[in-house]
Amino acid sequence: MPPAKRKGECPGAAPKKPKDPVRVPKLLIRGGVEVLEVKTGVDSITEVECFLTPEMGDANEHLRGYSQRVTCDVTFENDAPQKKTLPCYSTARIPLPNLNEDLTCGNILMWEAVTVKTEVLGVTSMLNLHAEAQKVHDNGAGRPVQGSNFHFFSVGGEPLELQGVLHNYRTTYPEGTIAPKNPTAESQVMNTEHKAYLDKTGAYPVECWVPDPSRNENTRYFGTYTGGENVPPVLHVTNTATTVLLDEQGVGPLCKADSLYVSAVDICGLFTNSSGTQQWRGLSRYFKISLRKRSVKNPYPISFLLSDLINRRTTRVQGQPMYGMNAQVEEVRVYDGTEELPGDPDMMRYIDKYGQHQTKML
């Protein structure tokens, strides 16, 4: 019996033309941080890969990623922790290629962060249950890292804005840390005077500061906290999860002054020593951030540009190294090919009582 004739196929008909291959971005440049100095095309896309290391306090040169042993005071009044027992926020500024030779034009280009892939590094290191840990029982393995854990990261065109909230307003924080100034009992719930920018790595204790939800219009942040005495860390490992950084208008963080800011905290829990003392354990975080060029209305008048030459407006961040000999930028990729917004979300625009459009610098 002859095979059944396929529907729609005529004898002697010419074979169908195969579909054209799907168009994808063409890899133009690939390399280290020096690629960021290369001038790119109009439609180029840039990918930056970097990592942030934990700021746990570092008990000594052999225990990087661990805090000093945590002690507990008997009274609220005498609470005075040491700096090496306080996990702090990690942050860094990544310089991006300069896009505009002429800043007097009506429209300018800005880098816009579109997506980020991120992952905690070293998750499997916590499977080591034989290195001076307290035994579960006399003949057992060591007690694993467990307890309260906090995982957080942010990507933005400006430094992360923070709100101070304290567990005990009478706590005396050590030199080298930045805590809310002049705390009162209201600081334990909400004091709107406790505002700050995350402008220095390893200086802002996590227990004092949270991301400010009323601000950070030009930053996207994500975090989870799990509290408890015996809570195990739950972490995922994958290179397929992508976080979109666009808002409801389809606009991502705009990198002001060609600067990208990343921040992270990854506290996995408490490590219990054989003596019974405990230390915070932190891990590093990897980032892969995709950026595209966005045409925006020039928000900077000539008078502002001239004054900015004297009073540099760009926030200075003392972060982890992202350029130089010890740069933590792993890889930069630039794509060139297939592929009226206000350029400064911090500027206030309004119509005054005379019907005139006004712009106010905050």
From Swiss-Prot:
- The sequence motif named Bipartite nuclear localization signal is recorded at 5-19
Q: Which keywords does UniProt give here?
A: Capsid protein, Disulfide bond, Host nucleus, Host-virus interaction, Late protein, Phosphoprotein, T=7 icosahedral capsid protein, Viral attachment to host cell, Viral penetration into host cytoplasm, Virion, Virus endocytosis by host, Virus entry into host cell
Which Pfam families does UniProt cross-reference here?
Polyoma_coat
- The principal location of this protein is virion
GO MF terms on file?
A: structural molecule activity
The Phosphothreonine modification is found at 338
State the Gene Ontology BP annotations: endocytosis involved in viral entry into host cell; virion attachment to host cell
GO CC annotation: what is one? T=7 icosahedral viral capsid
UniProt subcellular location: Virion; Host nucleus
Q: Which family does it belong to?
A: Belongs to the polyomaviruses coat protein VP1 family.
Instruction: State what this protein does.
Output: Forms an icosahedral capsid with a T=7 symmetry and a 40 nm diameter. The capsid is composed of 72 pentamers linked to each other by disulfide bonds and associated with VP2 or VP3 proteins. Interacts with sialic acids on the cell surface to provide virion attachment to target cell. Once attached, the virion is internalized by endocytosis and traffics to the endoplasmic reticulum. Inside the endoplasmic reticulum, the protein folding machinery isomerizes VP1 interpentamer disulfide bonds, thereby triggering initial uncoating.
Q: What is known of its domains?
A: A DNA-binding domain overlapping a bipartite nuclear localization signal is present in the N-terminal region of the protein and is required for efficient virus formation.
- Assembly and interaction partners: Homomultimer; disulfide-linked. The virus capsid is composed of 72 icosahedral units, each one composed of five disulfide-linked copies of VP1. Interacts with minor capsid proteins VP2 and VP3.
Name recorded for this polypeptide: Major capsid protein VP1
Question: In which organism is this protein found?
Answer: Simian virus 12 (strain wt100) (SV-12)
